[in-house]
Regions:
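C-terminal transmembrane helix and the adjacent membrane-cytosol boundary/short C-terminal tail
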Residues: 143, 189-199, 238-271
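Glycine-rich helix-loop "coupling/hinge" segments at transmembrane-helix boundaries
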Residues: 126-128, 140, 155-156, 205-247
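Loop-to-helix entry region at the N-terminal start of transmembrane alpha-helices
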Residues: 64-77, 127-147, 239-245
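Hydrophobic alpha-helical transmembrane segments of membrane transport/permease proteins
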Residues: 15, 21-58, 212-220
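Transmembrane alpha-helix signature in integral membrane proteins
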Residues: 62-97
Length: 271
């Protein structure tokens, strides 16, 4: 409770993030219509009392699709962040602790990945794998783990210098136990803060791939795909792009600000 009282920004954006999560969890109860129900006679209707966000080219209720899009976007984003967190942290810890050729190989691969524009490389990988959300997650993860690996490596190198690590090695403590008991607890906070701050960015990248045709496929209710479908009718039915775009902006801002707030709470030295 003390944290919430002292950090109003953290409190505000925690509440907003919980609202977003609530919308995702209770989408079937909140949405007025089935997001996949097509009624061609009601296609491209402007916002009204029956359809507050209007309808798309197939007569599907846009509000329902935006609500269900929250679930799709949030779930896939959290999966993406979890994947790059685990892979990046694992490789970074291995590189930092063992050093030598292991460190050299992992860091050279990371440097090679960083030398390419991330989104361009992700598009290339997604193009080879084929368009769907799972492949989009794989594509972005393939180019995004490097940040976590470099951060984890630098923290392991710092922790390795402590005398208790040397004492554990001298006492014959197994490597896996040293990593789990002495190394990871000293770096997990910073890694979690980084992951929390990345949620908004990863959500935007997933939406970007879907917008470009390399992510979600029809009829999945996903914000990036909805923007892609709506751009054809931008002059005739601008609401097809306005509402999914607003949803993306709101969620990205909320989770970016929440990530900054978590950084301030867990690591006040960063303020």
């Amino acid at each position: 409770m003390k944290v919430f009282k002292e950090n109003k920004q953290f409190t505000l954006f925690s509440i907003l993030a919980l609202i977003v999560v609530g919308v995702a969890v209770f989408a079937p109860q909140i949405a007025p219509y089935d997001p996949l129900d097509a009624v061609m006679l009601e296609s491209l209707q402007a916002p009204s009392s029956a359809h507050p966000f209007g309808t798309d080219k197939l007569g599907r209720d846009l509000l329902s699709r935006v609500i269900f899009g929250t679930r799709t976007s949030l779930v896939m984003t959290l999966c993406l962040v979890a994947v790059i967190f685990v892979i990046g942290t694992f490789l970074g810890v291995i590189a930092g602790y063992f050093g030598g050729i292991v460190d050299g190989v992992i860091m050279r691969i990371a440097d090679m990945m960083i030398s390419f524009p991330g989104l361009v490389l992700a598009i290339a990988i997604a193009g080879m794998l084929g368009p769907n959300l799972v492949n989009a997650v794989i594509s972005i993860a393939a180019v995004s783990w490097t940040k976590y690996a470099r951060l984890a490596r630098s923290m392991v190198l710092r922790v390795k210098k402590n005398l208790y690590i040397e004492a554990a090695v001298v006492n014959g403590t197994k490597t896996w136990k040293i990593l789990l008991v002495h190394v990871l607890p000293n770096m997990v906070t910073q890694m979690v803060v980084t992951a929390a701050a990345d949620i908004g960015t990863m959500m935007l990248e997933l939406a970007s791939l879907s917008f470009l045709g390399f992510g979600a496929t029809a009829p999945t209710p996903e914000w990036g795909l909805m923007l892609n479908e709506g751009r054809t009718y931008m002059a005739k039915a601008p609401w097809l792009m306005i509402y999914p775009g607003i949803a993306i902006v709101i969620c990205v801002v909320v989770f970016n600000m929440l990530g900054d707030s978590i950084r301030d709470v867990l690591d006040p030295r960063q303020e």
